[in-house]
Swiss-Prot record:
This is Damage-control phosphatase ARMT1. A motif (Subfamily III RTxK motif) lies at residues 439-442. Mn(2+) binds at D289, N290, D327. GO terms for cellular component: extracellular region; nucleus. Its EC number is 3.1.3.-, 2.1.1.-. It comes from the Eukaryota. Automethylated. Subfamily III proteins have a conserved RTxK motif about 40-50 residues from the C-terminus; the threonine may be replaced by serine or cysteine. One of its GO terms (molecular function) is fructose 6-phosphate aldolase activity. InterPro entries: ARMT-1-like_metal-bd_sf, ARMT1, ARMT1-like_metal-bd. Substrate binds at D289, N290, D403, L404, N405, Y406, R407, K442. Expressed by the venom gland. Residues 1-19 form the signal peptide.
Length: 488
């Protein structure tokens, strides 16, 4: 359905990039990038930094280079500490990595073509060859000038983070060093005062002997909203600068309601509360976003789901490599639980022990598939990662956290604002099961057909689109005839 719109766009992009004269609709960036369009993305096209009025442009021009700079600075500042941990041979590796990241920043800021990843001599970086195959295929579609500002935003942004990780993958001693690790740990420790409050609430619900349906529905809504608003703690959106949560997050929940543009918590309740056979497992998959404070809230939600019998198993999906600054990897997941278990606060320690038991018993699991660190939208999952797609199809509810997951659900296309998530997923052929997206808005894509009037909602939020202050809890039931699909 998109080719009539995309192919002319690609032709115009090619003309802007390679034409002898500046074409109508094209211009030169003040800092020297020729061929940008001084307008927002048209509807029906992939998001791209070629549009000077877009968030994609801001991200690729300012925030992503700032993230690369932050990593360079932290490596130089922590050089002695890293060498002490990984050995004297890591010194030269760090120098090479810093040089590589500086080159990456230059390539990015000057809109150079994306190059294939050099292959390692072992299996430590297995998906590099897969990335190169996809890059070659994309060049066949877009042409040889597959550059940061002219290609799809999702490809350019993901490639930048993948290339940062690749600089370490080519090393021997610091191969497993998480260059975002300290920042992710600070996301939790900076919110230390709020953690015992949340842990206490999760424990109360886990140990509660009896609750009415109405009480359970209200508590589910609270834990979903806590998980949502924890998504404000996104280091990629803040260019890697630290963020702090203070105060009682439960008491603050009601004050955030005016910022919740779409609230489908009732749909989630109806999906999970449907009758199931005694031997039918109720699996909830959570595709994680940020480590630290947000992950802590996700653990609270998962504890509530299992302890109240709304799920028999929760499967967490993390990343294999450092990704988008604060995304959760397997180490981050276990680190948070270990942090709680070693705490002197009794509620925090008890909650950490409970989380560990849920992992040991099999009520929880944490997994990481290479697909999560590609540039593919989720409409491509069935073809690119069929095993993962089939695994997700086993779930009763599939929860996606954060802005990047939301963009991938929509194929990183600029849909009309009134397009429902149901419509987008139908056209992109992604419907493994019931889907719930918890996302604070850091871009301009929000499906508003179930929210307030789209025009007034747009006026109200335009200045806040990229701030993460507003959010959505939006559902798409697999069976549109199901009663849960009508409860929005």
């Amino acid at each position: 359905m998109w080719s009539p719109l995309i192919l002319p766009l690609l032709a115009q992009i090619f003309a802007c990039a390679f034409g002898d004269a500046v074409n109508e609709g094209c211009n030169v960036d003040p800092k020297g990038i020729h061929g940008l369009w001084y307008l927002d993305e048209p509807f029906g096209v992939y998001l791209s930094a070629i549009y000077n009025g877009s968030l994609a442009y801001i991200m690729m021009k300012e925030r992503v280079p700032a993230i690369v700079t932050t990593v360079i600075n932290s490596l130089e500042q922590d050089n002695d500490e890293i060498v002490q941990k990984y050995g004297v041979e890591s010194q030269e590796e760090l120098h090479r990595i810093v040089d590589s990241l500086k080159s990456l920043k230059t390539e990015l800021s000057t809109n150079q073509p994306l190059t294939n990843l050099p292959l390692a001599h072992d299996e430590a970086d297995r998906d590099a060859a897969v990335w190169n195959e996809h890059l070659d295929r994309q060049r066949e579609i877009e042409g040889p000038n597959l550059s940061y500002f002219f290609t799809r935003f999702l490809l350019a942004e993901s490639y930048t983070f993948r290339k940062m990780a690749h600089a370490f993958a080519l090393a021997k001693n610091v191969r497993n060093f998480d260059f975002f690790g300290k920042q992710k740990e600070h996301l939790l420790t900076n919110s230390a005062k709020s953690l015992p409050i949340l842990a206490h609430r999760a424990l109360l619900e886990a140990n509660r002997s009896k609750a009415t349906k109405d009480e359970m529905r209200e508590e589910l809504a609270k834990f979903l909203k806590l998980s949502l608003w924890g998504n404000r703690f996104d280091l990629a959106a803040s260019s890697g600068h630290e963020i702090t949560q203070a105060g009682d997050p439960i008491e603050l929940l009601s004050s955030f309601d005016e910022d919740l543009l779409i609230d489908h918590t009732r749909v989630a309740w109806d999906i999970l509360n449907k009758p199931h056979g005694p031997n039918d497992p109720v699996i909830v998959d959570i595709v994680l976003d940020n480590a630290g404070y947000e992950l802590f809230n996700d653990l609270c939600l998962a504890t509530f789901l299992v302890s109240r019998g709304l799920a028999t198993k929760v499967r967490f999906h993390a990343k294999q490599i450092p990704w988008y600054v604060s995304d959760v990897n397997i180490h981050d997941f276990h680190w948070v639980i270990g942090y709680m278990r070693s705490s002197s606060d009794p509620h925090l320690k008890e909650f950490g022990d409970l989380c560990a038991r849920q992992l040991e018993s099999g009520s929880w699991s944490v997994e990481a598939d290479a697909f999560w660190t590609t540039f593919h939208g989720y409409g491509e999952m069935k073809k690119q990662a069929p095993v993962l797609y089939n695994t997700l199809s086993e779930a009763t509810l599939l929860i996606f956290k954060g802005d990047l997951n939301y963009r991938k659900l929509l194929g990183d296309l600029n849909w009309e604002h009134t397009t429902s998530l149901d419509t987008a997923l139908f056209h992109l052929d992604f419907k493994p099961t019931n889907v719930l997206s918890l996302r604070t808005i850091k871009a301009r894509r929000v499906r508003r057909s179930y929210a307030r009037d789209a025009a007034s909602c747009g006026r109200r939020t335009r200045r806040r689109w990229a701030t993460g202050r507003t959010g959505v809890i939006v559902a798409s039931a697999k069976n549109a005839q199901c009663a849960c699909a009508k409860s929005r």
